Amino acid sequence: MASMHEALFSSRLLQVNSSFSFRCALPIISSPAAVSCAIKSTQFFKQRCRTKVRDFSLSSLSRRGFVCRAAEYKFPDPIPEFAEAETEKFRDHMLNKLSKRDLFEDSVDEIVGVCTEIFETFLRSEYGGPGTLLVIPFIDMADTLNERELPGGPQAARAAIKWAQDHVDKDWKEWTGTD
C-alpha cells in the first residue's frame, strides 16, 4: 500500500537541456491501457526534449539550500544618557499622577521609587529604540509593589505603562533624530 501511495504521488524534476527545469507530477493510473499511455507519453516527452529525469523530493530541498531565511535586524544598543533623561521625565510624571489619588495613601514616594528603579534598569540595559519596549518591567513593577504590600500596585503599573507607550518611542526618535 505504501508503494502504491508513493507511486500515485511521485513527482520528477525534468531538466530540459540543463537550462530550464520544471516540476511535473505524473499520477499512475491503475488500468493497463492508461499506464501504457502514460509511459509512452512520458518516453516521447523525454526523447523529444532530450531530458534527464531525476527524483525530486521535498527532503532534498533543505540539502540543496532552497531555505528562505528572514534577514536579522539588530536593534541599537541602549543609550545611558537617554535612559537618565527619560527616567527623570518618568519620575516627574509618576509623582504628579499618583499624588492626585488617595488610593496610594502616604506611600507615593516609595511607589514611585520602586517603579522608577525598575524602569531605569530596563532603559539602561534593554531598551534599544522603537520595537523594544517590553511589558515585562511593568509586570515587575506591579509584582514588586504587591510583594512589598504597597497600595495600588496594579494601578501604578498601569499608569507607568500608559506613560511609556505614549512617550518613550517618541522621545527616542527625537533623541536620535530618526523618523
Swiss-Prot record:
Any single Gene Ontology cellular-component annotation: plastid nucleoid
Protein's cellular compartments: Plastid, Chloroplast stroma, Chloroplast nucleoid
Signal sequence, start to end: none
InterPro entries the UniProt entry points to: PRIN2
Gene disruption phenotype: Misregulation of photosynthesis-associated nuclear gene expression in response to excess light, and inhibition of photosynthetic electron transport. Defects in embryo development. Dwarf pale plants. The csp41b-2 prin2-2 double mutant is embryo lethal.
Transit peptide range per the UniProt entry: 1-69
Assigned keywords, A-Z: Chloroplast, DNA-binding, Plastid, Transcription, Transcription regulation, Transit peptide
Main function: Involved in redox-mediated retrograde signaling to synchronize the expression of photosynthetic genes from both the nuclear and plastidic genomes, especially in excess light conditions. Required for full expression of genes transcribed by the plastid-encoded RNA polymerase (PEP). Essential for embryo development.
Full protein name: Protein PLASTID REDOX INSENSITIVE 2, chloroplastic
Gene source species: Arabidopsis thaliana
Organism lineage string: Eukaryota, Viridiplantae, Streptophyta, Embryophyta, Tracheophyta
